[in-house]
């Protein structure tokens, strides 16, 4: 008995202090678990929503994830610390607190009072020795991390949580969970509407002008291009600093009047910058990492800019009607309306139904800017025997009656679908006239931002798209990744094959018709050209004729001898006022519709077309040009 008595006392275990685990290892462990879980859900989200599968999607999602984690973690820690001891004891999750032996629990529970008993600690089967420690503020914070991770699971799939049966929890927990779910759904709606997001640097142009030298302040920002839910339009938002939850600047894309890359003289020290100009006069300069990002941002913003159908219809109707009518009336051209009854040159039946007579009167000239000519008709004219594309903008109007010997080298300005230095806004208005029913209507114009390059503007389901064209010295055309021997080959290809769109999606767009170009108003010059006419059809005005092309079309010479006599008579009659002037070409091959103003081409046009004009237009020509149509 004496030997057995002290046995149990000697065998009683002495409590050994548990070493405190490394907090860095703990943070890394839970961060890895959260990252792996979020990565799987992120990949699943991209598979379900391929619209967000962009190269920088991972960075954007992770930044948003980290920012929300910090906010929620701080709020949860403050809530737990403010709550009473009982609430704190109930908030401890099962994974953070490990089951203890009865005697160990009693030893550890004594210093903290009776508000925390052994029954409050959950009994979990899997025991982790590294987190077996007493209750402390650090332990509570680590337990909150597990609670936040559970909340992430609910945030990743809010729909099942919203539809699930209510769990047994305190009213405060239910209220906070409902609040978190509502904020999650609102954030998800905004995330769905994001078009593009990236980190850039920007400054206001006024600050750049006010600063001396390079003292202008560049600010880091997170640029977000998204669709506004209410108006169904896009907005551009600047988040300063990049982690800010609300934008510092929010610009609707309908208020942006210009988006372009900067010229070397504008930003000599910065290569990868572009400019945003807003209607209220504000101007923002943004800097990207490389040239690729710069051009892609400009293309995305320009692609999302939607001018709006109602405004374009208003402008086009004004241009077609009252606005141009006032200009015609100011020219005092009362006799011009009689030119409608004059005989006209024979027209080909292929295009005669589509294109009206060239320059019969002022309103016809205005209407020509909105004439839509089928591209197939233009291509058939080129393929016809003797046909060529040199017929300026009369391709298909006078058939294939061309003189090969007098045909000079062709330029883009010789074709009816080329509109010269037409602005981006005006080009969009031309192709969008009529809305989606004019799907495939196009024009080709010079680039506003890149001299020497051209832009194909076309109607894509009621929206204007702009595709850049590059021409080398041999006339070869480069469109995206495709090369063509000429612009005509490019038109033939895209007439039968869909155009590859950079935005992706169903590219069911082919070129169907084009907007026929209009004569630009003549520019004032030192020596005005005189229209070739008979002795009875002459003009002694020293100014440029706004309707001189109309007069030339209405008064063609009946024969080469008449043309020579008309030229000499016109020169002698106008010498008293302004001296001799070179004759203006008659409407025909390489006529004034070509936007080349060199005198050599004008002389070639007269020599090539003097013998081709029909004599039927001679009887009424004196009346058509008797008035002065000078436009001052």
UniProtKB/Swiss-Prot annotation:
Domain SH2: 417-515
Residues modified as Phosphotyrosine: 52, 629
Biased composition (Acidic residues): 400-409
Tissue specificity remark: Expressed in spleen, prostate, testis, uterus, small intestine and skeletal muscle. Among hematopoietic cell lines, expressed exclusively in B-cells. Not expressed in most tumor cell lines.
Assigned GO CC terms: actin filament; cytoplasm; cytosol; plasma membrane; ruffle; stress fiber
Subunit structure: Homodimer. Interacts with KIT/c-KIT, SHC1, EPOR, PDGFR, VAV1 and VAV3. Interacts (via N-terminal region) with SHC1. Interacts (via the phosphorylated C-terminus) with GRB2. Interacts (via its SH2 domain) with EPOR, INSR and KIT. Interacts with GRB2 after B-cell antigen receptor stimulation. Interacts (via PH domain) with VAV3. Interacts with NTRK1, NTRK2 and NTRK3 (phosphorylated); after stimulation of the receptor by its extracellular ligand and subsequent autophosphorylation of the receptor. Binds INSR, GRB2, ASB6 and CAP. Insulin stimulation leads to dissociation of CAP.
Protein name per the record: SH2B adapter protein 2
Gene name linked to the record: SH2B2
């Amino acid at each position: 008995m004496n030997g057995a008595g002290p046995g149990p006392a000697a065998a009683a275990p002495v409590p050994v202090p548990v070493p405190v685990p490394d907090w860095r290892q703990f943070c890394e462990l839970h961060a890895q678990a959260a990252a792996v879980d979020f990565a799987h859900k992120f990949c699943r989200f991209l598979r379900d929503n391929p619209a967000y599968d962009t190269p920088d999607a991972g960075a954007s999602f992770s930044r948003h994830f980290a920012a929300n984690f910090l906010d929620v973690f701080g709020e949860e820690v403050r809530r737990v610390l403010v709550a009473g001891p009982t609430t704190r004891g109930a908030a401890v999750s099962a994974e953070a607190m490990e089951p203890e032996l009865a005697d160990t629990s009693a030893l550890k529970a004594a210093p903290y009072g009776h508000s925390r008993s052994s029954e409050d600690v959950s009994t979990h089967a899997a025991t982790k020795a590294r987190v077996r420690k007493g209750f402390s503020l650090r332990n509570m914070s680590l337990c909150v991390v597990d609670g936040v991770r559970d909340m992430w699971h609910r945030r990743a799939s809010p729909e099942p949580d919203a539809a699930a049966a209510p769990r047994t929890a305190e009213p405060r927990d239910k209220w906070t969970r409902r609040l978190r779910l509502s904020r999650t759904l609102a954030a998800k709606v905004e995330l769905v509407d994001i078009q593009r997001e990236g980190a850039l640097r920007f400054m206001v142009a006024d600050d750049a002008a006010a600063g001396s030298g390079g003292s202008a302040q560049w600010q880091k920002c997170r640029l977000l291009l998204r669709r506004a839910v209410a108006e169904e339009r896009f907005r551009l938002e600047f988040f300063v600093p990049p982690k800010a939850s609300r934008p510092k600047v929010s610009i609707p894309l309908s208020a942006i009047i210009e988006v372009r890359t900067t010229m070397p003289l504008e930003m000599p020290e910065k290569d990868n910058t572009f400019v945003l100009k807003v209607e209220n006069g504000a101007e923002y300069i943004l800097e990207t990492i490389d040239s690729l990002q710069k051009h892609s941002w400009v293309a995305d913003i320009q692609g999302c800019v939607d001018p709006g159908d109602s405004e374009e219809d208003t402008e086009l109707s004004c241009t077609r009607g009252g606005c141009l009518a006032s200009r015609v009336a100011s020219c005092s051209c009362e006799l011009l309306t009689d030119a409608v009854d004059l005989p006209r040159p024979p027209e080909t039946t292929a295009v005669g139904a589509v294109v009206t007579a060239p320059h019969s009167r002022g309103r016809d000239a205005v209407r020509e800017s909105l004439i839509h000519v089928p591209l197939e008709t233009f291509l058939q004219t080129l393929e016809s025997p003797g046909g060529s594309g040199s017929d300026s903008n009369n391709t298909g109007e006078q058939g294939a009656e061309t003189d090969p010997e007098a045909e000079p080298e062709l330029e883009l300005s010789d074709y009816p679908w080329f509109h010269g230095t037409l602005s981006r806004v005006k080009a969009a208005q031309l192709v969008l006239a009529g809305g989606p029913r004019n799907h495939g209507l196009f024009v080709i114009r010079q680039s506003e931002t890149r001299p020497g390059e051209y832009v194909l503007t076309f109607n894509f389901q009621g929206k204007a798209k702009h595709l850049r064209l590059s021409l080398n010295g041999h006339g070869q055309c480069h469109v995206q990744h495709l090369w063509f021997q000429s612009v005509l080959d490019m038109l033939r290809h895209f007439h039968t094959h869909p155009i590859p769109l950079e935005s992706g999606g169903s590219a069911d767009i082919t070129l169907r018709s084009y907007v026929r170009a209009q004569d630009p108003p003549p520019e004032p010059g030192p020596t005005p050209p005189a229209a070739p006419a008979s002795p009875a059809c002459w003009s002694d005005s020293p100014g440029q004729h706004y309707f001189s092309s109309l007069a030339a079309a209405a008064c063609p010479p009946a024969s080469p001898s008449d043309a020579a006599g008309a030229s000499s008579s016109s020169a002698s009659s106008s010498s008293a006022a302004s001296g001799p002037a070179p004759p203006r070409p008659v409407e025909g091959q390489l006529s004034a519709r070509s936007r080349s103003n060199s005198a050599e081409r004008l002389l070639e046009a007269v020599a090539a077309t003097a013998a081709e004009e029909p004599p039927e237009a001679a009887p009424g020509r004196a009346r058509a040009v008797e008035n002065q149509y000078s436009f001052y």
